[in-house]
């Protein structure tokens, strides 16, 4: 079952940052394939969704690009800057906190058990 686009949309930037943090250097098609692979086909990241994110990250100084010619084709690789590495860590932390909060909202009783378990 595919995850609805509306649920994925707000998390795409975090997903891209996480992949770049783990893989150091990736090109667009590679990112789309990795998302599909890791999500077991539940998330399909389109180029129309990916490239605006990558371009915004680049204009914000979070990623830099490197062009390489492979089989007579220009391939653009994306890499995190130092600022990008810090941003990736922060975005991932925020997303994890958000997901934990959603989990509590969906199952309030479970959330209370977790709060008491930490005490």
Where are these regions (language model features)?
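Basic amphipathic alpha-helical segments that dock to polyanions
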Residues: 50-57
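Glycine-centered, phosphate/nucleic-acid-interacting loop/turn motifs that mediate DNA/RNA or nucleotide
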Residues: 61
């Amino acid at each position: 079952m595919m995850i609805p686009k509306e649920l994925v949309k707000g998390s795409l930037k975090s997903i891209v940052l996480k992949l770049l943090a783990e893989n150091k250097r990736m090109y667009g098609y590679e990112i789309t394939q990795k998302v599909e692979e890791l999500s077991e086909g539940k998330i399909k990241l389109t180029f129309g969704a990916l490239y605006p994110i990558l371009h915004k990250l680049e204009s914000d100084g979070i990623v830099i690009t490197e062009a390489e010619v492979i089989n007579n084709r220009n391939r653009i690789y994306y890499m995190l800057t130092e600022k990008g590495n810090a941003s990736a860590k922060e975005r991932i932390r925020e997303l994890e906190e958000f997901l934990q909060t959603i989990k509590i909202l969906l199952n309030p009783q479970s959330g209370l058990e977790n709060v008491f378990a930490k005490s």
